[in-house]
Amino acid sequence: MIQGLTALNPAGKRVLLRCDLNVPLKDSGNGVKVISDDGRIRGSLPTIRELLSLGASVVIIAHLGRPKGEVKSELSLEVVARRLAELLERPVSFSSQIVGPEVLKEATALKSGEVLLLENIRFNASETSKDDGERLALAKELAKLGDLYVGDGFGAVHRKHASVFELAQLLPHAAGKLIAAEVAVLEKLTQSPERPYGVVLGGAKVSDKIGVISNLLDKVNILAIGGGMLFTFLAAQGKEIGKSLFEAESVELVKQLLDRAEKLGVRVLLPSDIWVAPAFANDSPSLVSADQIPSNQMGLDIGPESARAFASAINECATVFWNGPMGVFEFPNFASGTKIVAQALSEVSGLSVVGGGDSAAAVRALGFSDSDFGYISTGGGASLEYLEGKELPGLIALR
């Protein structure tokens, strides 16, 4: 059983808080990186505020991108510290260090109600090391900075990293409000969904979703497949997919999944029409039947008939989980499938869950707000691995 915040007594203590602040950045045009979606920062606010209200000081540990153990200025968390201070409406100190005497001095100087954000933890190669000893050594250095540990970075709980796994075991620990909420929603999806239960999957790679489909097949009533992964499904049915991306090595597995779905009575929805183009660009869209994609074209979105069919199926459901866009939503010509599915999801009267990563970015980019949906998960890979039935290191460590 994962312990909640009430298990700790943080008054007057320094709390090491592992957050997921891995936000997307974009170039503002003058070479300065700005945050394009602050959803993950906002997701961390309830736990930070709760700890501060309980009289703690908070040292935040987080990562940004994949610097691979090197200091990369474009992946500094300094820009995140500024945005966090705005959202918290209080100062947030930023340390350019991760461990060592300088940051120890900064941490021990914190007073109750103060916040310190450390530099990108992944600038230290030991954070993501495959060597248990290296990770433990870093965790021991980090443990010097606080009295208690709270894990709240749901987007990283599937990683066996020093600040997620080893550090939690060195200090009295608990799960933050975000992790508690994420686990409660995912438990409902895997253990007690209200029916009919629909799962809508998209995104580029079917290999990322095979485990999820396999684990959920005997739990769902409707499975709708869109995004780049749908072409592997069409190929498995022997259909012409033109220049569309697909994973030849997954075709046999997909055939097995389709057979199993049929035996279990799961309604599998595949698109009947596809928006195609001659190249991966926002140009020359044309609409074709899903079984007649020309050899010189590639599929970039589900067509309007398919989107309406998906929306209709979603409207029948009491529980819906969606992960992965229906098309290349970044191109306006190929965003309609994702938009129609998102709109249908926002109208579900039961539980609608948007599963992290690209899906969360897509709904925000298309003008929806978080409140339009029952729940938007902050964890892409973490949500999927949980739904696969895997044990996640960051959750094991919080027991």
Task: List the predicted regions and their residue ranges.
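Active-site loop-to-helix "anion-binding N-cap" substructures in soluble metabolic enzymes
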Residues: 1-399
